[in-house]
Amino acid sequence: MKIIIKTEKFWRYYFIVRILYLFFAIFVYAKLTTLGDTERYLTAPLSVISTSMLFNSTIMMDSIGSILGLLGGSNVITNLPATLLSYYTIKWAIDKFEFRKNVNNYLLFVILSLPNFCVWTGVFSKEMVGLVFSAILGTLFIDFLDGKYKIEKKHWFAMYLCMIFKPQYFPFILQGLVMVYLMNRYIKSVDWKMFLGCFVIFCNLACLYLISDIVNQYADIMYMYFDDPNAKSTRANPWTEENDFFYEAPAGMFIAFFGPTINEMMNSPTHMLAGIESIVILVLFLSLGFRLIIRCINSYKINVTIFFSYFVIITGIALLHYPFGIFNPGSAIRYRTNFFFLYILMFLYIKKYYKQFYLNKDKIIAKI
């Protein structure tokens, strides 16, 4: 009974936080900067509705937004469905795997209540949709890790949304799912699992090499989309020479995920707040992955299936986020929201997996 009361209290407080963030986004944040394309979606004319919305993310958002916008454009009422959808999606995913029983609830509450995450997923935006499909695909990935391979209608729908809104993420999520399926179901030898994992990584690197000329051409034109004279936070183009995209990738992937650099944090209060939030994220992720790190250091052992599937998904998505986040810290933080909850679920699973691993190990030792 205590657990039920505690659970209700946790989600009641979190619901209040999400509602407060909605009011903050509409009445404060929107006055300081723009809420992406939210206002445009919610003021679109009904004439934009067409069958093209099934294949184009922008037209889909315009079409749905034009209907919601009948209630007065962008306001608390028209953005409330986004807040509710985000809240119940997060609650469903966390409760599905009972993560609250294995993770410090205060830590979990903090990571789910981070400002930029709550603001961008609490208004009618593509980031809100990104949260939904990343949550559903994240739960499918964890189900695969647990040996449950049933793909339901909601998973197919999430794949569809991912292909419409962020098609570049899907190949790496699919690779992770296939690797887990093969390693868990058919490959029992650790050596062969290592071979498969290394082979998948090699194939990805080979593909990058084969399309390097196309990537270089893309890098040459990418900067112009961010080189807006009104964009005060746009950085200098780091890709001035051939293959700079690849040379700068290791540091660039981290910067694109983190957001503002130290110098930018020192020169802007808003960047300082965003930087502090990113520091909190890194600390929380390290905390969630602490047992995995300790196990690697102490025994040089690791779950090969988790390692390679996580590596492909996390680094693959980070690489694709890199060109969208390297030029502007604001864009980096906003676009990060699309896959942030997927990362949260993955790190929560690590925490749960190794907590249960050590608990079972202690029980065996106690019996001996």
PLM-predicted stretches and their roles:
Residues 93-115:
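Transmembrane-helix signature of polytopic, membrane-embedded enzymes
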Residues 37-73, 251, 256:
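Short hydrophobic/aromatic helix or loop-helix immediately within or flanking a transmembrane segment
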Residues 99-103, 147-152, 190-191, 266, ...:
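Membrane-interface helix-loop-helix junctions at transmembrane boundaries of multi-pass membrane enzymes
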Residues 59, 71-88, 279:
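Loop-to-helix entry region of an early transmembrane alpha helix in multi-pass inner-membrane enzymes
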Residues 130-146, 342-346:
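Specific aromatic-rich, kink-prone transmembrane helix
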Residues 122-129:
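Short acidic/glycine- and proline-prone juxtamembrane loop motifs at membrane-interface regions
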Residues 80-100, 283-290:
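Transmembrane-helix motifs of polytopic, lipid-linked glycan transferases
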Residues 28-40, 163-299:
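Alpha-helical transmembrane segments and terminal signal-anchor/GPI-anchor hydrophobic tails
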